[in-house]
Every structure is written in C-alpha cells, then in structure tokens.
Amino acid sequence: MKRIIVNGWLMISMGVFYSCASHKYTKETLNLHAVQVDLSMEQGVKRQIEYYEEGVVYAFSFRSGGVLLILQGPLMKTPIDDFKPSTSLKDKHLIEKGMDKKGLKWRRDTYSSFRVCYFNVIPTEERKFYRILNGIKFKATMCEW
C-alpha cells in the first residue's frame, strides 16, 4: 500500500513538472530591411510589426508582462536605452543586461545591423528569454524598397 502511494505521488509530481517545463516553440523568420532574423519563439505570444522611415520594429508581448523587441534603424529608441547595465559582454556583439527599479530583468543585444532587447521580465521567466536571444541566427539579405 505504501509503495502504491509513493508511486502515485511520484507520477503526479512528474506530471506537474513536465507540464510546467514543456513550452511549444515555433520558428519565426523576421525580415528587417537588410537582415533576415531566425528565432525560436514560444507559441501564444502577441506579435506586432511597425514600419517607419529608417527601419522596422517587431514587438512580442508575453503573458507574464515581458516584452521582446527586435529592431533595425538608428533613430528608434527603446524603453531601456537609458538604463545602466550591471554587466556588459562583447564577443561577436555587445550584450548589456541588468535589473530595473522594480526588480524586473532586462537585456539588450546590439549587433552591427540590428538590436534585440527584452524588458519587464520577472526573474523566474528570464531563462525563457535567454533561450530566445541566445538562439538567434541571422543573415544579410538584399531588400529592394
């Protein structure tokens, strides 16, 4: 009897673990003016595209309140442009990250031809955003306007 209860508890706890851990992702291809960006995005995220004179902005809004921006264009400002980073890394691109006054996480990746950033991310959700940003692949394209 004790063994059945322990096995039942183990099965229930593993089911809860796997239901929380499994998110469905789809491949997104974004066409910026001169760059094609491929990334793996969680399903159920709201997507908004805005074109302006010098570039394009893709905004992804998550249920948890986090926002992911992918943009091209030198004059476009983001809500985190004035934040002071707690750490900066420079490898193939510049990575800056930190925490705002409310304790929410943010990160800004600056590539040569576009920028990617997230903000308003609760610390427990940050791993999901890292997965998206660290999985970005891009290639230059020739786009006629």
Segments and roles (model prediction):
Residues 1-6:
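Positively charged n-region of N-terminal signal peptides that target proteins for export
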Residues 18-19:
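C-terminal motif of bacterial Sec signal peptides marking the signal peptidase cleavage site
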Residues 30-84:
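Secretory pathway targeting signatures of secreted, lumenal, and periplasmic proteins
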Residues 33-39, 43-47, 115-145:
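Surface-exposed amphipathic alpha-helical segments
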Residues 58-60, 100-111:
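Short, surface-exposed beta-strand/loop micro-motifs that present aromatic residues
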Residues 64-71, 76-78, 101, 113-131:
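Short, surface-exposed beta-strand/loop "edge" segments at domain boundaries and coil↔beta transitions
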Residues 80-106:
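Short Gly/Thr-rich strand-loop-strand
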